[in-house]
Regions:
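C-terminal functional module detector
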Residues: 1-3, 23, 183-188, 192-348
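A metal-dependent hydrolase metal-coordination microenvironment
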Residues: 1-155, 167-183, 191, 197, ...
Length: 348
């Protein structure tokens, strides 16, 4: 299955981002993205979608109820044909509409923290009496940025040297994902939540996490069911199918290119399943992890680490059903940081 690298969750001047569509495409090209999914707030500028300067540009939307106070419940809607903003006050009605349009619904930044210094509210998801969502955003770069910005000094450090502070998804978000996985399949995505905002404190001004930087940071690696052909509709649908199936992993490529990372189930030399797939318990079933870079590889079963190895590969014989997923960590600037999170293999 061909691997393509892209970014999900970015904003333009159509809502509260600082970059126009041509500018955001240029940033995507600089980062060598194969695809980019924009998610402007409460609007759906469909006419911008298409192949733009070699980048597959998919237009989705991030919907929320602007009248709700405090603010919460942001939903990323991909593959929808109509603007569903009017349904924002009812999360369940919104989810039902996304599914009627054969779209994909992902809960954005389900867990958030907001220190007082940022003057920004935390915007978590709070209404969990819902059904019909496809997954959650387990790593939101802007959310982590906000959580670490506890003082002017730390904010300046984040603005100019984010990789010295950013370490990975919130533990609370990963725990939430594992709890949800006990009863349903939940696809994990990650993204930058790119806005290109400016930080101003007195005479100092800095762009907060510029688009070109963010597009090299938390990225989505999909395994498509066919190679891109250059036909927009066909290639867009291939990306959306891969996301729906969970045929993807999330990677912090700013600390090491993860292209080629693989997690699969084998019986002997026969590959039976990959990320997002299900496989039955059987004799000689083995889970295999391969990494293009040396890393601290961790295999989790139902949220608990069952095997850990530092290196380029990991193998584990499986006799027990459950949800298996992989986390990988690498050292960067003297600190262990999250690098790769795979979607699960479901052993039934």
């Amino acid at each position: 299955m061909p691997e393509y690298v892209g970014v999900i969750h970015a904003h333009t001047t159509a809502s509260d981002g600082r970059a126009s569509f041509p500018e955001i495409v240029r940033a995507a090209r600089r980062a060598r993205l194969d695809f980019l999914v924009t998610t402007d707030h409460n609007c759906l500028p469909r006419d911008e979608a298409g192949y733009r300067d070699g980048v597959l540009l998919i237009v989705g939307q991030e919907i929320h109820d602007v009248d709700r106070d405090p603010q919460c419940n942001h939903l990323l809607c991909l593959g929808v044909t109509d603007d569903l903003t009017p349904l924002a006050p009812s999360p369940q009605n919104l989810l039902d509409a996304v599914n009627r349009q054969s779209g994909l619904a992902f809960i954005a930044h389900p867990v958030e923290f907001a220190p007082a210094f940022t003057h920004e509210p935390a915007i978590p998801w709070v209404d969990w009496d819902i059904k019909g969502f496809h997954g959650i955003e387990i790593w939101n770069y802007m959310s982590e940025f906000k959580a670490h910005a506890t003082s002017l000094r730390r904010g300046v450090r984040l603005a100019y040297w984010p990789t010295s502070v950013i370490v990975g998804p919130f533990r609370e978000t990963l725990d939430l994902w594992d709890r949800l996985l006990r009863t349903q399949r939940v696809v994990a995505i990650g993204g930058p939540d790119a806005h290109g905002w400016e930080l101003r404190r007195g005479p100092m001004k800095a762009t907060i996490l510029p688009y070109p930087f963010l597009f090299r940071a938390v990225r989505t690696h999909i395994l498509a069911d066919h190679a891109f052909s250059g036909d927009f509709a066909a290639d867009r649908d291939a990306v959306l199918r891969a996301i729906r199936a969970g045929h993807l992993f999330i990677a912090y490529d700013a600390i090491g290119n993860s292209r080629g990372f693989d997690f699969a189930a084998y019986a002997g030399r026969t590959r039976l399943a990959g990320m997002g797939d299900a496989v039955g318990v059987q004799k000689k079933l083995r889970l295999s992890v391969r990494s293009p870079r040396r890393a601290d590889l961790r295999l989790l079963h139902d949220g608990q680490v069952v095997r850990r190895k530092r290196g380029w590969s990991l193998q584990h014989d499986v006799t027990t059903p459950g949800v298996y997923r992989v986390e990988a960590y690498r050292g960067h600037w003297g600190q262990q940081r999250a690098w790769v999170f795979t979607n699960p293999i479901y052993v039934e």
